[in-house]
Swiss-Prot record:
Belongs to the phosphoglycerate kinase family. Its EC number is 2.7.2.3. ATP binds at K201, G293, E324, G353, G354, D355, S356. This is Phosphoglycerate kinase. Substrate binds at D21, F22, N23, R36, H59, L60, G61, R62, R118, R151. It catalyses: (2R)-3-phosphoglycerate + ATP = (2R)-3-phospho-glyceroyl phosphate + ADP. GO terms for cellular component: cytosol. Pfam families: PGK. It is found in: Cytoplasm. It comes from Thermotoga petrophila (strain ATCC BAA-488 / DSM 13995 / JCM 10881 / RKU-1).
Length: 399
């Protein structure tokens, strides 16, 4: 899938309206984690170096289509100014004369950030009037917000109906790596899935089963599969209404010759909190009532490492346990290290967004994978083989 990028257009003196993903945690008016802001810097800097006038659009949180002070982007403008080393002008409005005036006064090489796009009810409804207003401010639309690519909103899809839309560098990288692992992975291809819910991963399992050689399953979702196989899972989290589906997926994998690898042991405790009594049990011995599995055990870590050892392509989506608590983080950490080691051997390794990306950051391993996706829901939908509206709306490269 070849999309036009910011490098394919002349930006000198042009007004560029850029959809970025600045949906970052803010507390007491201070940005707590600026990973997403940093991720957008290469595209913003490139546009400025080319002599563009840059207008930035982003959402933050889930305001109900009206202004709400705790979701203001003002703290983001401040942090972006520090990271860019230059003033970022900020307009506390999304539409209207104040916005028009600020854009008219913008000079080449200057940046303007508008207020949270979701302060307007038309954003999430992809309202053509709102999109038309934003498009009227600029000559070119740059879409660098992969995190919202699975949503058809006014700021990413709507504007593209009125002015040409091209991909920013971050979007380009997401498309490149996710396309590779979804459509033409080098084999052996191993998929590692975790997280709480089987229901979130059904589409991914079904789609990647067509290409994968092995699928390793950890995280709380493993207990739904283990229960489907008749194992005793104690008080572990199980999606009772998905047990039959888990059986079907295991059958389907067998038919397709895909090896599904489930944990052989687990770290259990009676409560999900730090410092509680914990022990390791083998899955075949069963988990006692009142205890729940909160991480994969050491034998499973070794098994997973062995199943990963020859992989040329790895996709990892979802943690192996409750990694936020150190007592239950070891499984996730060891799997992350094993996948990182494969990157050094030349394998393509892609970490899906959301919790897996948070885990990788927690262990300081973010630079040791081919690609760590910035989009949770968007990366899942891409891996499911769906067409994402926020990518479809970007102009295709001319053949």
């Amino acid at each position: 899938m070849e999309k036009m990028t910011i490098k394919d257009v002349d930006l000198k003196g042009k007004r560029v309206i850029m959809r970025v993903d600045f949906n970052v945690p803010v507390k007491d008016g201070v940005v707590q984690d600026d990973t997403r802001i940093r991720a957008a810097l290469p595209t913003i800097k490139y546009a400025l170096e080319q002599g563009a006038k840059v207008i930035l659009l982003s959402h933050l949180g889930r305001p109900k289509g009206e202004p709400s002070p705790e979701f203001s982007l003002a703290p983001v403008a401040k942090r972006l100014s520090e990271l860019l080393g230059k003033e970022v002008k900020f307009v506390p409005a999304v539409v209207g004369d104040e916005v028009k005036k600020a854009v008219e006064e913008l000079k080449e090489g200057e940046v303007l950030l508008l207020e949270n796009t979701r302060f307007h009810p038309g954003e999430t409804k992809n309202d053509p009037e709102l999109a038309k207003f934003w498009a009227s401010l600029a000559d070119i639309h740059v879409n660098d917000a992969f995190g919202t690519a699975h949503r058809a909103h006014a700021s990413n899809v709507g504007i593209a109906q009125f002015i040409p839309s091209v991909a920013g560098f971050l979007m380009e990288k997401e498309i490149k790596f996710l396309s590779k692992v979804t459509y033409n992975p080098e084999k052996p291809y191993v998929v590692v899935l975790g997280g709480a819910k089987v229901s979130d991963k059904i589409g991914v399992i079904t789609n990647l089963m067509e290409k994968a050689d092995r699928i390793l399953i950890g995280g709380a979702m493993m207990f739904t599969f283990l229960k489907a196989l008749g194992k005793e899972v104690g008080s572990s989290r199980v999606e009772e209404d998905k047990i039959d589906l888990a059986k079907e997926l295991l059958e389907k994998a067998k038919e397709k010759g895909v090896e599904i690898v489930l944990p052989v042991d687990t770290v259990i405790a009676q409560k999900i909190e730090p410092g509680v009594e914990k022990k390791v049990v083998r899955i075949d011995d069963g988990i006692p009532e009142g205890w729940m599995g909160l991480d994969i055990g050491p034998e499973t870590v070794e098994l997973f490492k062995q199943k990963l050892s020859d992989a040329k392509t790895v996709v990892w989506n979802g943690p192996m346990g409750v990694f936020e608590i150190d007592d239950f983080a070891e499984g996730t950490k060891q799997v992350a290290l094993a996948i990182a080691a494969l990157t050094e051997k030349g394998a393509i390794t892609v970490v899906g967004g959301g919790d897996s990306a948070a885990a990788v950051n927690k262990f300081g391993l973010e630079d040791r994978f081919s690609h760590v996706s910035t989009g949770g829901g968007a990366s899942l939908e891409f891996l499911e083989g769906k067409e994402l509206p926020g990518i479809a709306s970007i102009a295709d490269k001319k053949k």
